[in-house]
Structures are given as C-alpha cells and as structure tokens.
C-alpha cells in the first residue's frame, strides 16, 4: 500500500492596509491552487510567510516584531510586502530570514516557497479554491484593487519607492474579477489603490474590452460599469482631480454609493506646498458645496496630518477653520511621524511631540462635535443598512456612509433574524459621535 504524503502546510501573517490584504489573498489563492494547506498556527506550518507593511515607523516596528515572532515560533520564514523593499533593514535585525521580496512580487514568493517546501505531487485542493479566489474579508464584501503604485511624490510618503509608479490593471480584468465576486455572493465592493482617481493615466486611458464591449480605462468608466452589477460600490483613496466631479452624478443617481474618501491631508496652502499636495482650500470648499448640491446624500471621508514640519499655530488654525466650514462626515487624523526615506525628514522646524499631541486633541475634539451633529441629522430618517454581524443580542451593520473597519456602525438591538450580507431598511432612533442605533422598518 502506497504511503500518503502529508500536504505541505504554510502559515501566513498579513499586516498593513487593504491593498496589502489583496496581495495576501492573491498569494494564498495561488498556494491553495497548487495544493498547499494554509494553517493558522506556527507549530503546524512547514514555513511561514509574513506580508509586511512599511508605511510609517510604527508599522515597520510591528512588521519586524511579527517577523521575529515567526522566526522564534517556526524558524523558516519568507518576508514579502512593503518592508521587503528594504532588505538590508530586515537582514540587520533578522539575518535568519530565508528570503525577502518587495511588494506585489507574487511569482517570486511562490518560487521561494517551492524551493523550501516543494509543491505537492497531486492536487486534491483545486476544487476547494473558489472561483473568486481566497478572500480574507467576510463573504459579503471584498476589496477590488485596480492599480499598483503611485505617481505622486508627497514628501511624507515613501509608497512610490516601495511600490513604484502607477500601473493600472486592465479594465477588462478588473471588471471580470468584480463579476466573479458578485457571482460568489459579494454584496459590496470596495475599490482601492494608492490613487483611485488616477486609474488609467499610465496607459493614457486606452480602451479595453469587457464581454466584447469597448470600455475606457478610467475611474468614471469603471464606476459606470460597476454600477451595472447591482451591488454597493464604494470608492476609496480618491485624489481630488477635476474629473472626480464626474462621478458625483453617478452617486446622485444611486449607481454607486454616495461615499467619497478623499485624503486632503491639510488646509494651509503653505503646509500643502511643503507636502507637495494640491493646495487651494477655497476651491476645495467650493467643490464640496457643489458636490453636496448635486448629491445631498454624499458622505465625505478624509484624512489629515497635524504637526507636519513647519506647521505653525496659524497653519493649524486654518485646518480647524476648514473643518468647521467643510463639515466632513468621517475624518481620520494622524500626528506626523517621520518615515525613514521620506523627503519631509529634511524639512526644518520639526514640531515638538507635545505640540503635536495638543493639536491632535483639539482637532479630534472639534471633529467629534461635527460628526455628532452630522449623525444627529439622521435620527428619525430611514436608511439602508448592510449587516456585518449577528449574535443573540442583535445585529451590527453599516449604512452607505460607513466603510468596514474605519467608519461607524449601525446597531440593531434585538434584530436576530438576519444574516451577514442582508440589506435592510432601518429607521434611525439614536446617534452618538460615531454610531447609529435603529430598528428594522
């Protein structure tokens, strides 16, 4: 009787942003297709892959700690992802790492796995890989990555040095993936990239094909096509180019979610110039006003940095004034943190940590008040909610205004007869600074 060879087992650690998560999903899909088993513990694994983040220093530290833990617990480790672009830094701390690759180096990662843990001779797992591939998100939503890299050279960021310049995926390929996701039961697609509004710039917005039909490689064309799938489509990381105006009518018509994630970073023209970001606050406020006139339901999310080198109290006050005027719905704020390799490190007038902390607190206090007022306006109204979790106490979902993990939630106490992915009409009964409570209509 022939001896059955056990399936080779791979452990996997995925760190960082949703874009990194998509890279992890792709590697895991390839591994499963080839017959590798993916296991949740170091002890059972023949090898561990760590997909790292290297965006800010705290993320670098977390990645180095994760690599160290994998080495201590298992011993055979391959490193990939953004921090992998800095091989010397990893080798200095962890010389025993077997191999290191940069971000989106899927083929190299698989070659290294094959070298240390040879492929199984037969493939009983092929039918277990779903058509849409392995997903690390809940079944009812998925991230759709449309491009790699970035053409901007913001002084606080090192993404281009790690992930390279913009490379747009062919639009036919993107739309085919979206269709597979919908066929697999996904109810919400979150479009992600380093710069979603630049989609197609690198290929001069050339015409691609989907189902035999010509489609322009652009954000607006992509949104028009995704709207035909009959699911929620949410846009993230939208740089404020003029053509962003063209997607607002699609939101007003209900074709894609009335949700725009635009990282504005600051409101002082001087600081924006130091950041190498576009800098007309008045124009931005005018656009926001115009967008809301076209699409009153529009939710605006943004992120800002306080304590950037050279930021004075006057600059910071301009930022607070902008918040008061813009009344954004969802806001993230970060204290400036030096990133190794970023141009901003060389700027004069670094802001003391205690000043950063004090400004961050003032920023958050103001935005918390604005957020509470914006949510209070929804009390008494009916909204659509997609369910994320259900337990014996009730259900937790999100409105069209809430992206997973970064925004608020809608709590439906006592609502147990639903399942994740269901979309309900809900009457809002209560609101606090970030979340809503309501009951099914």
Swiss-Prot record:
Phenotype seen when the gene is deleted: Mutant shows a lack of methylthiolation of protein uS12 and a decrease in transcription of a subset of genes.
Record-linked InterPro entries: Elp3/MiaA/NifB-like_rSAM, Methylthiotransferase, Methylthiotransferase_CS, Methylthiotransferase_N, Methylthiotransferase_N_sf, NA-bd_OB-fold, Ribosomal_uS12_MeSTrfase_RimO, rSAM
Domain Radical SAM core: 136-373
Pfam families, sorted: Radical_SAM, TRAM_2, UPF0004
GO annotations of cellular component type: cytosol
MTTase N-terminal domain residues: 8-118
Protein name: Ribosomal protein uS12 methylthiotransferase RimO
Gene behind this protein: rimO
Superkingdom, taxonomy of origin: Bacteria
Residues given in the record as [4Fe-4S] cluster 1 binding sites: 17, 53, 82
Residues that bind [4Fe-4S] cluster 2: 150, 154, 157
Gene Ontology biological-process annotations: tRNA modification
Organism expressing this protein natively: Escherichia coli (strain K12)
